[in-house]
Amino acid sequence: MEVPSAVTLNNYVGFDSITSQINRKLIRRGFQFNVMVVGPSGSGKSTLINTLFSAHLMDSKGRLDYQAPYRQTTEIHVTSQVVRENRVQLQLNLIDTPGYGDQINNDKCWEPIIKYIRDQHSSYLRRELNSHREKRLQDTRVHCCLFFIRPTGHSLRPIDIAVLKRLTEVVNVVPVIAKSDSLTLEERAAFKQQIREEFVKHDINLYPYDSDDADEEEINLNAAVRNLIPFAVVGSEKAIIVDGRPIRGRQNRWGVVNVDDENHCEFVFLRNFLMRTHLQDLIETTSYYHYEKFRFKQLSSLKEQSSLATRMGSPAPVYPSEPHLHTATAQ
């Protein structure tokens, strides 16, 4: 097929309004963003989410009493909220994972998390293959996983490495150093460098990824983000009066940490990354990369089963419209 040539119009036609047409339709429909938080109890997961969206959206599912027993398994808790900013409506599914990493034996503590992520892919695929497919498919696929690293100042725990390697295969992972104000600036810089080296050593493939069609601006932006990962963050829903004005902050042994001050922590960089530059890309990457890998494996498996059944003279497997897909086939 020949490359079409560019033609100059003699008069105004009006198809340039397609962008505003799309914009009106998208605003009318609203948007959806599904965020998972993974980290041990006391990491400040709920507080960071509430700080990110400047609203109380999540209650802590962790242990409120230090004498309370630890959970024996990793649980999954989903909170759904709708937030509005100007004319834009955003439906949030906030997925907490209480119990993760809290046991004495954390062997396979990641399995409920991986299963949940794959189950959402499976559910979406069932709807997609349904002969009476919905006009707008309900999307519960996890778009972003915030992975909380304890501010030890040393290195990643073996369990962190094991879980990160598995998570990055199925979801966009963004690591953060929780409660980073417990470290000095020098300790924080050294800790971040140590963790980055471990990411490379263990071949942990973190978001963002450079796509084949990324332009120079996107590539440079992604490179700048990678230089910040893992984000050293502090969350706070409390207002503290400093110099006569309220700020979102935390009081620590060195003074007051202003959450929104780039010199104090990297919360602002994380918020800008998640909300202002990469929100749509997180959603699209989930669909075009992680979900597409899952979909390909599932449909290839069904095709092989169908081919084998034909050769054996058995009835071919039915493409599912009900919970018939099994996530166990996805590796």
From Swiss-Prot:
Pfam families: Septin
Keywords noted in UniProt: Cell cycle, Cell division, Cytoplasm, GTP-binding, Lipid-binding, Membrane, Mitosis, Nucleotide-binding
Domain Septin-type G: 29-301
Region (G1 motif): 39-46
Positions with a binding annotation for GTP: 39-46, 73, 99, 179-187, 235, 250
Lineage: superkingdom: Eukaryota
CDD domains: CDC_Septin (cd01850)
UniProt region (G4 motif), positions on chain: 178-181
Cellular component GO terms held in the UniProt record: cell division site; cytosol; mating projection septin ring; medial cortex septin ring; meiotic septin complex; membrane; microtubule cytoskeleton; mitotic actomyosin contractile ring, proximal layer
Major subcellular location class: cytoplasm
Keyword hit for Mitochondrion: no
Region feature (Disordered): 311-331
PROSITE patterns: G_SEPTIN
Subunit field text: Component of the septin complex composed of two copies of each spn1, spn2, spn3 and spn4. Component of the sporulation-specific septin complex composed of at least spn2, spn5, spn6 and spn7.
Free-text function comment from the UniProt entry: Plays a role in the cell cycle. Involved in a late stage of septum formation leading to the separation of the daughter cells. Involved in the correct orientation of forespore membrane extension during sporulation. Binds phosphatidylinositol 4-phosphate.
Family: Belongs to the TRAFAC class TrmE-Era-EngA-EngB-Septin-like GTPase superfamily. Septin GTPase family.
Entry protein name: Septin homolog spn2
Organism annotation: Schizosaccharomyces pombe (strain 972 / ATCC 24843) (Fission yeast)
